[in-house]
Amino acid sequence: MKTRVFISKNASDCESLVHFCIQNSIELIAQSLIEFEAVPFEIESNYDIAFFSSIRSGQFFFKNELQKSNVVYACIGQTTHSKLKKLGIECEFVGEEAGNPQKIAAEFKSWVKNRTVIFPQSNLSLRTFSSILPENQVINKIVYKTNLIERKIENCQIYIFTSPSNLDAFLTINKIPYDAKVIVWGKSTENRLLKKGIIADFVLAKSNFAELIEVLKSIN
């Protein structure tokens, strides 16, 4: 029987995975279960650092805010940094293990010292990074809204959840078969899964497609 894999990303966002599945005769259902919309915002205070937890936070932030020469930019990991570079944004702090935000947050706190940080974010942000800093150093700014999409997904042998929000959207009208393998994109998604009473079979530390493909090879 042909293996069927679900990932909560659109095919256009995971070309290397699509190619791997074609090569290995794997049926891939690539479907993001969330969508985004801009939220109007104003920034009343000065800041020294802007931290981006995803490319979306950067995209929506720079729709309203100009890049500033006196501001330092930082982000959660290499994938986000690569996409920010396409917007002309170079980051001085880039997390090494995007799948382990708690670890990166501790490193980020040491790097920030006493500077003020703005955190462009979604309305559903977990605020992992801003919560570890003193309140007087933090500007939490909602710049976009995350909307969950209810969509029925065919039963699969392998499920790959790329964010807590995608997991929540999936579970609104779907169930994970008891014998399916579950791969999650980092600790935050793993923790959300645990709250639902489900244990992940694999947790991606770096949360990138090279790591994911190696895991899929080990399963098959």
Please place each PLM-identified region on the residue numbering:
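Signature of uroporphyrinogen-III synthase
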Residues: 1-220
